[in-house]
Amino acid sequence: MKIIFAGTPEFAATALAALLKTSHEIIAVYTQPDRKAGRGQKLTPSPVKQLALEHNIPVYQPLHFKASTEEGLAAQQELAALGADVMVVAAYGLILPQAVLDTPKYGCLNIHGSLLPRWRGAAPIQRAIATGDDETGITIMQMAAGLDTGDMMYKTYCPITSEDTSATLHDKLAAQGATAICAVLESEETLQKYLAEREVQDESLTVYAHKLVKSEARIDWSMNAVQVDRNIRAFNPWPVAFIQLDENNALRVWNSTISNQNKADAQAGEIIAIDKQGVHVACGENTFICLTSVQWPGGKALNAQQIAQTQKLHVGQILP
C-alpha cells in the first residue's frame, strides 16, 4: 500500500522505522517545522524528518491545514495529490481537519500511547504514571475530528512497574506502537478486517491527559511519599521534578524510591538521613522518600554516593 506517515518525535520515528522494513511504500512524510534546539539554538530537524531524509522520502512541513487560509488549503491539496491508500499519524502535533482525514482511501490511523478512552490528549504516558496506573498500552484508532475520539481498531498492553519513568515507558510504548501498526497494516485485507471490526469508544470512561506544565513538577512535601515518587518518575525526562531552594536556584530530582527510614514527628520536607542509598526526606501522612539522583544548577546529575560527598544537604534541613 501507499502510505503517508505523519509524526514528529522519537516515538513516531520508531514506528516509521518499522514501516520502512515492510513491503509498503512510504510515499511522503509530514512532520513539524524544524525547531531551534541545543545550546547553539540551531534549527534542528525532527527525528522523523532525519529518518525520512536518510531514506530519500519526500518531506512536507506545513504550518497547518486550515482551509480558511491559502497556505492551509494548498497543504490539503498537496496531500490529496499524493494519492495515498492510508495515512499513519503518531505524535504529529498538528490538527488534521476532516477534509484531510477523509483524503486517503482508508482514512488516517493514529498510534496513541494509552488504552483509550483513558488518557486522551497530550501527555498519556506521564499521566498514567503520576496517577498510579498499573497498566497502559497502545491503541490504534481510525482518526476522527475530535481529540483522540476515533474508533479503536487494535490494542496492546504494557504493565507499568514501580521503577518506570516516562522515559522508560515511552521507549516500551514506542516499540509496541511500531509492532501494532505493522500488524494492522500487514496487508490490505488485514487493514480491511480491523476497520470492519473497529470499536466505538465509551465516552463515559474518558479521562483526559492534560499537557504538562513546569510548575507541576515542583515537589510538594505535603503529599505522601508514594505520590511524590510517582510524580518524580512521571516528570522524568521533562519537565523534571524540582525543589525550589531559593528564588533563583532549583535542585532537580531525577530519581527516587520509597524510603526504609522513618522518624517520629518529622516535619514534611525534613531531611531525616543521608546515606549510601540517598537523601531520605519526610513527606505527608508520616511517609518517607529517598532521593537517589539530584542535580544542582549548572551541574551534572549526581547519584546517591556523590550527593553525600557534596555535603550541600544536611540532616535536619527543611526542604522548601
Curated annotation (Swiss-Prot):
GO MF annotations, alphabetized: methionyl-tRNA formyltransferase activity
Keyword presence, Heme: no
InterPro entries documented for this protein: Fmt, Formyl_trans_C, Formyl_trans_C_sf, Formyl_transf_N, Formyl_transf_N_sf, Formyl_transferase-like_C_sf, Met-tRNA-FMT_C, Met-tRNA-FMT_N
Keyword line: Protein biosynthesis, Transferase
Residues bound to (6S)-5,6,7,8-tetrahydrofolate: 114-117
Coiled coil feature spans: none
EC number from the UniProt entry: 2.1.2.9
Catalytic activity: L-methionyl-tRNA(fMet) + (6R)-10-formyltetrahydrofolate = N-formyl-L-methionyl-tRNA(fMet) + (6S)-5,6,7,8-tetrahydrofolate + H(+)
One Pfam short name: Formyl_trans_N
Catalytic EC class: transferase
GO cellular component: a single term: cytosol
SUPFAM superfamilies, per database record: FMT C-terminal domain-like (SSF50486), Formyltransferase (SSF53328)
Domain of life: Bacteria
Function comment: Attaches a formyl group to the free amino group of methionyl-tRNA(fMet). The formyl group appears to play a dual role in the initiator identity of N-formylmethionyl-tRNA by promoting its recognition by IF2 and preventing the misappropriation of this tRNA by the elongation apparatus.
Family: Belongs to the Fmt family.
UniProt name for this protein: Methionyl-tRNA formyltransferase
